[in-house]
Amino acid sequence: MSSLTGFDKEKMINDLHGVIYKIPNVNEPSLEEYVTADEYLSGNIREKLKIAKISTLIDLQYQDHVDALTKAMPQDLSASEIEVRLGATWIDSDIYEQFMFEILSTSGFAKQHIHITYSKFTDTWNVSNKNWDRGNAKAEKTYGTHRANAYRLIEDCLNLKGTKIFDYEYDDDGKKVAILNKKETMIAQQKQDSIKDAFKNWIWKDFDRREHLTQKYNELFNSTRPREYNGDHLEFPNMNTEITLRKHQKDAIAHILYGNNVLLAHVVGAGKTYEMTAACMELKRLGI
């Protein structure tokens, strides 16, 4: 760029302050790589902010990065804006255990043997020793049935399965055959609905749990900001002077020039033909 403009490097960096950003590199602080603001202030903002804050301990020039990223950060969602379903894998198993023990009033002795675990390899939840808490009315009547106690139903809920109850008979060849018991299945699935409703009412009640889960949800799923391309700097030499491109058209052309893979999902009449034609001419002119 210095050879093209005739300006020295430091002048260009100063003149482009806020338009370009030096990418912080904690492992190699001396490495210099610059990107445009629309690229830097997009993607996983929360992760970039962590790196920028660490980089300020080495070089205070990155404080501008911290300020810009803080402004670009998606606004945190509140608990009322987050829908949590029973079985969501981002929720810790100990929280599910706490819910299960509270609604079923599980005895202290049974708590030592009944546990909820999650396997990332099989993507399944497991409730161990489901039959250990025998005689618990809440597990066998309120939230369960005599054919499927609440611990089994909770396990099926966690795995997003509707519980099915089967009876077994032997056919003429002596083979054991499973026959769906529709009545018991319907009752079991109604109990599952009661468990799901209880979970929705329970999950946000405790203040500390609510704060922990909202923070975790925002960190996991609310950190990304889509890139917004800005085509205001594009000049389009030799374009017909009777054609004036609108703001969204210039931005779409910038997206084509820098994005490599673009879908122009505009409505009819938005000017897609001009966008594609102008982008093709610019790509050709720039030798891209």
Stretches with model-predicted labels:
Residues 219-288:
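ASCE P-loop NTPase motor core, strongest for the SF2 helicase catalytic module
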Residues 2-221, 286:
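Charged, low-complexity intrinsically disordered regions
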